[in-house]
Amino acid sequence: MSNSIQAIRNVYDIEKGARDNESPMSDEEIVKLLERTVSDKSLIPNYHRFEKGYAAEDLFMRIFSLLPWVKTVVPLGQEQFPEKSKEELQVPDYEITFEAGSESNTSCVLIEVKLVDGDKQTHELQKYKYDVLKKYSCQKNEPLLFGIFWRKQGVWTINSIESFAEKSSAYKISYE
């Protein structure tokens, strides 16, 4: 599945590049490219959901890289090997290096980007997904934060897990 997720990301990047060059791809062209490159065909109907998530990740990177105290925003990529490793350890979306008190003193944080779309006012993070992200964070000895884009409000929030309410199988956060 990991290779299929990376293939979907590659199609998104190609589609975005074509659009940026004022030569947008048709839906048929996108579907053909997905069919040729994505081995797990069950993921293809979910392309638009992936597309929204990738667009949120791109927006996060562009906005937060403009902050004067941010030194670097490094995408950590969608591809992870061995594929089964995501069951126990998952790499988040970004590592950010920022000034911590002075220009010469820097710190790093790991960011997992989430999109809350439509009229939703809450986001749920499954505990097992948090656990595998947290394990990576602990191994890197860097804090894990969540960059959440609340589309309806047009607002980003940066949250630690402590901002979420713990439920039986998930952590839940509300914009309200």
Locate each region found by the language model.
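Domain-level recognition of nuclease-like catalytic cores that cleave nucleotide substrates
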Residues: F149-E176
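Short, surface-exposed basic-aromatic patches at helix termini and helix-loop junctions that form
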Residues: S65-W69, E99-G101, K134-N141, E162-E166
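Short, flexible/disordered intra-domain loops and linkers
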Residues: P45-R49, K84-S85, D119-L125
